[in-house]
Amino acid sequence: MIIGVPKEIKNNENRVALTPAGAKELVTRGHTVYIQHTAGENSGFSDTAYEAAGAQILPSIGDVYNIAEMIVKVKEPIAAEYSLVHKGQLVFTYFHFASEEKLTRAMMESGSICLAYETVENPDRTLPLLIPMSEVAGRMSVQEGARFLEKPQGGKGILLGGVPGVKPAKVLVLGGGVVGHNSALMAAGMGADVTIADISLPRLRYLSEIMPANVKTLYSSAHNIEQELPTTDLVIGSVLIPGAKAPHLITRDMLKLMKKGCVLVDVAIDQGGCFETSHPTTHAEPIFEVDGITHYCVANIPGAVPQTSTLALTNATLPYIIKLADKGWQKACKEDKGLALGLNIIEGKIVYPAVAEAFGLPCYPIE
């Protein structure tokens, strides 16, 4: 198979979808790998390293899309790439379609096969290609939240972990999945007073057993969240419904309960966000303010630490890339039901129910 890896062009997206080691593995199996010039540079991989692994370098993004049977990316194609995706081409990346109608319709019109990292499942219903980036995003969300609590950044001017004789900041984590788990661990490690909320009692029991003493658990309800907000300094929103839009757990009216200078970090923003007042931001302009509350809503948080996140991502994706290249997407998905759940759009038809539901469009069975 001919595999193409374009350079990511989303704002400050520094990751790359394939390392030289991954390229070598594919070339060894008889596949042809094309890498766009400097695609791996920000992740620490030179064109020379890819060439040494047997990959070929192409000068432009158009060249890569034009020649490839399978495009492997990190983030969804942006508007400038829509016309480059062509009929019958397999695109394997994070899509998050349910929050992006223009992207969804563009990919339907392209006639491509869209296989989304975020909806591939393990037999136990965990999400193997979302987990590594959720781990990174969870940890970084606390780092970024702590930074924007500083006075020069417009925050309240408090240190997350406090100091002896001074209370630490209070952190509320909404959602006890992988992002929430990692957020709570990071905040607790920095010395904050942490509460993690979830609707699953079994999950709360598990978290209560494994978390440090400065992490408390709370059943997630509108009432309980409202009770927490007046004393909370930093909220991490990490709610996930696979493939679907995230629910709004904090409304605009609820912002009035918070003190000015508090920070909301919406890690769920690539699925539409879990705060009513959220809208996507970038690493170049990461924050905005609503009613005196700072919102951090960067949709590609791990892109800021590409040398960590590229390796974490490609460790997870490479086995699937190999399977797709070796067998073709139809046979690979027929043999691996978890991989088949990654299929969101096939040649103009939506085949993932949550995406169809988000836009009131028909959902077709996978043939």
Label for each model-derived stretch:
Residues 23, 47, 104, 142, ...:
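Generic hydrophobic/aromatic pocket-lining and core-packing "Φ" positions
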Residues 2, 8, 79-169, 298-300:
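Glycine/serine-rich phosphate-binding loop and adjoining beta1-alpha1 elements at the start
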